[in-house]
Amino acid sequence: NKNALKSLTQSDFIIDLTKEGLMHSKETKEILSSGSRIMTISDEHPEILSRLKPDLHLKEIVRDAVSKSKKSKSMEVTCERGTNLKINLLNTNTVGVWGWTDKPGTLAHWPGGLVVSFPNKSSVNGKLVFKQGDINLTFKRYFESEVIFIIENDYVVDILGNGTDAVLMKSYLKGFNDKDAYATSHVGWGLNKRSRYEALTMYDKNDLNGTEMRALAGGFLFSIGANEFAGR
């Protein structure tokens, strides 16, 4: 709708209450280029929003994390569970969200408190192991059995595991009939200490969008799907 787009580009401040958010719209770049600020209020239960209201201290924490990420040549993710993932960060687009927008031409979402990088093409390789208790935001549930991603040049080339979680993941991704559904979208980590690990158990799936889990302090974030910076 050209008239709607024109109105948005002429607005100084936009409050986004849509289900998925303007951040996933192809028109967003044009809107931000006009100097408009977009404040996305994530589709979360009101109690989540009240617990994770904007925190002034988060801004410096997130900005510091973004700075460190941008200065790094690579990211290596390892743990005793078997994960060994290497990510090339050279010339990677990295952004941080602290929960509000205070600069023209920027977009933020509430809740905030995370940093994410969008790796360039052929930048992600290794093994990512999900164990019981890890969080699967695709299905808004906790893993109950082991799932292993084998990743080569950004793409999940094999999914290992004998439990329900592996079966669901294989079936879900196969349903897209699209190789890029298996490609790395972004990686990052959470920085919001107010986020609660057990929050997924407290709400119906329709009552949350999972932003709290993405911002969970200390949690590593790995996402597959679209990545415009890698041409996908």
Where are the language model's segments positioned?
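Active-site bordering "gate/hinge" segments
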Residues: N1-E144, I148, E152, D178
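Dual-mode signal for accessory low-complexity, basic/Gly-rich regions
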Residues: Y142, D158-G225
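Compact functional segments
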Residues: E228-R232
